[in-house]
Design a protein with these regions (language model features):
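Glycine-rich, small/acidic residue-mixed loop/short-helix segments
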Residues: 63-180
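Glycine-rich, acidic
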Residues: 1-91, 95
Length: 180
């Protein structure tokens, strides 16, 4: 799902269904497992931890499959498809969407990512404090190919903070959450 966790979608019979009764039943049944209700903010944190990109937030029509690390899903052996010529011409380029870890600050949207020498290299598209990882994390858009870069600075309202630039997802690459 949107959070990178294993889950379920429930469908109902409409008028013959009580969402409130189901909600109460699930909370009661989950007490032993310490199930609690949460909100969209917790889902947002999990989305970032899982490295799940959101169209319109983390990327838009300016990005191609190479920029997003999705080239393995392109069948270049196929005789033709819309955009094939442009993708072949561009060639395999490094990803422009990466992650950052910032132990001293919670990154927020539009915070500026800089190289260690202060050059602007990108910006935060989604950020949060990760209770699981005990650090600030963010998805960042890089202005150009910086796949080999591993350290940088984050300019926020509170100052400049050291960050580690990393691949996504931040953890659970095999999508095993919840762990049995």
């Amino acid at each position: 799902g949107w959070t990178g966790e294993k889950g379920f979608e429930l469908y109902s019979d409409g008028d013959n269904f009580s969402g409130e009764e189901l909600w109460n039943y699930l909370l009661e049944a989950g007490k032993e497992e310490k199930l609690i209700a949460s909100d969209i903010a917790s889902m947002h944190i999990r989305r970032i931890e899982a490295g799940i990109l959101d169209y319109g937030t983390d990327f838009d029509q300016r990005f191609d499959p190479f920029d997003l690390g999705l080239q393995k899903f392109i069948d270049f052996d196929k005789s033709d498809f819309i955009g094939k010529e442009a993708l072949v011409k561009k060639g395999n380029s490094p990803m422009r969407i990466r992650g950052i870890r910032c132990p001293s600050e919670k990154p927020v949207v539009d915070d500026e990512l800089q190289s260690v020498d202060g050059k602007v290299i990108g910006s935060v598209t989604a950020g949060a404090w990760s209770p699981f990882l005990e650090t600030g994390i963010a998805i960042v858009q890089l202005n150009y190919d910086l796949e080999s870069l591993s350290e940088g600075k984050l300019r926020t309202n509170s100052g400049i903070h050291d960050v580690k630039i990393c691949d996504l997802p931040f953890h659970d690459k095999e999508k095993n959450i919840p762990i049995d």
